[in-house]
Amino acid sequence: MSIRNTINRIIIRRNMSDSIRHYDYLVIGGGSGGVASSRRAASYGAKTLLIEAKAMGGTCVNKGCVPKKVMWYASDLATRIGHAHSYNLFEDLPLTKENLTFNWPEFKKKRDAYIHRLNGIYERNLTKEGVDYVYGWASFTVDGKVQVKKADNCTETYTADHILVATGGKPIYPAKIPGYDYGVSSDEFFELEDQPKKVVVVGAGYIGVEIAGVFNGLGSDSHLVIRGETVLRKFDDCIQETVTDTYIKEGVNIHKSSNVTKVEKDESTGKLNIQLDTGKNIDNVDSLIWTIGRRSLLGLGLENIGVKLDAKEQIVVDEYQNSSVKNVYSLGDVVGKVELTPVAIAAGRKLSNRLFGPEKFKNQKQDYENVPSVVFSHPEAGSIGLSEREAIEKFGKDNVKVYNSKFNAMYYAMMEEKDKTPTRYKLVCTGEEEKVVGLHIIGDSSAEILQGFGVAIKMGATKADFDSCVAIHPTSAEELVTLT
């Protein structure tokens, strides 16, 4: 793109005025799915506009996957530094958890600067692909136009042949609990300026588990309040049990079968008192973090054009991402199918392939089956396909065979028992050919290991296919191709 064209594009963005501008494709939401779809559409020559309310990259870049993983790295490194003595390293240094120092404010500055750089990269990539973008809050008018209210309260109006709603989600707050607003959401976790000495995380899902693990690894007195007996209840039993037991062993205070009933604040100290329905109180708390779920981010005037929502207020779409209104589409967290960044990216690209690409893509759609997912807990956990329970429900107990292995990875061979974390693998197979319909792993590097095995399961691999692969020794992953 020439300098003149670049300048012209900047001028267009600055002077999109009161006149109504028309596009081939208008995308509401600058998260992973929206950005991917807009860039792919523009690559086919579609005149494309992307509207984002806050910062490019959406939840993943700004309040989710990316800053979370950076925090996880810090916490994981803190834990591993403590293992050095087992390998006779730094024997003259006190590398215990009690002696750990972590400069949270300085680390936050570096992390936030990294995220800001990513925001800029997103903007530059959009410009490179020829996508126009504006910042502001989008809403539909009754005649199907899209109005954007910008930060300066100016309003711009657009029309388009095709419109994608990819606005993502937002955290849920327990508004009925007295004092709930003394706590913050998982989004606001990244805004904490100082490390809390004592923290309570509420919620058994992967977000709560990851945040509690980060705090514990960095030396905070970490409490996790869950309604059931185990964390990660949407995962296979082996993951639920292993992560729960390991967290307890590593010092996370898990309050099982508990619900928060009231939150009080001592105005003189700023400390919180968390009351549970078990009669127990957690006092002298510095920070309370709610991770009890997320809901679709709407407020777009979808009712003005008749877009149908389900009982959870998620946009109803068919297998091709079509909403109930012609030429209006939706994907990502706002539809609630598989709420993962790579899924939104893949769905966004395939939608644009279908709408603007060559004939070979006219029936392309996203496959939501066998999507690998991981939890950056301590240790990591990963899963693809059916859990053992789901497989039995679907195929019958007599048609399901399960292979299990539990061991200590070689990394821990030099350590005392108290410092070891378990590795546990499970294959769920069905039918005479023993097709692998589920794989569940817990242990170091599970996220990296799962990616390759995810390809195998997506291709329909059988237990015999796994067995035919020569193991890489010595590794933990070799266990998956030697299970008996």
Curated annotation (Swiss-Prot):
Cofactor: FAD
Single annotated GO MF: glutathione-disulfide reductase (NADPH) activity
Superkingdom, natural source: Eukaryota
Catalytic reactions on record: 2 glutathione + NADP(+) = glutathione disulfide + NADPH + H(+)
Active-site annotation: 473
Annotated glutathione binding sites: 32, 39, 122, 242, 349, 426
Keywords, alphabetical: Cytoplasm, Disulfide bond, FAD, Flavoprotein, Mitochondrion, NADP, Oxidoreductase, Redox-active center
InterPro entries cross-referenced by the UniProt entry: FAD/NAD-bd_sf, FAD/NAD-binding_dom, FAD/NAD-linked_Rdtase_dimer_sf, Glutathione_Rdtase_euk/bac, GSHR/TRXR-like, Pyr_nuc-diS_OxRdtase, Pyr_nucl-diS_OxRdtase_dimer, Pyr_OxRdtase_I_AS
Binding site for NADP(+): 204, 207, 210, 227, 233, 293, 339, 374
Cystine connections: 60-65
Protein known as: Glutathione reductase
Species this chain originates from: Kluyveromyces lactis (strain ATCC 8585 / CBS 2359 / DSM 70799 / NBRC 1267 / NRRL Y-1140 / WM37)
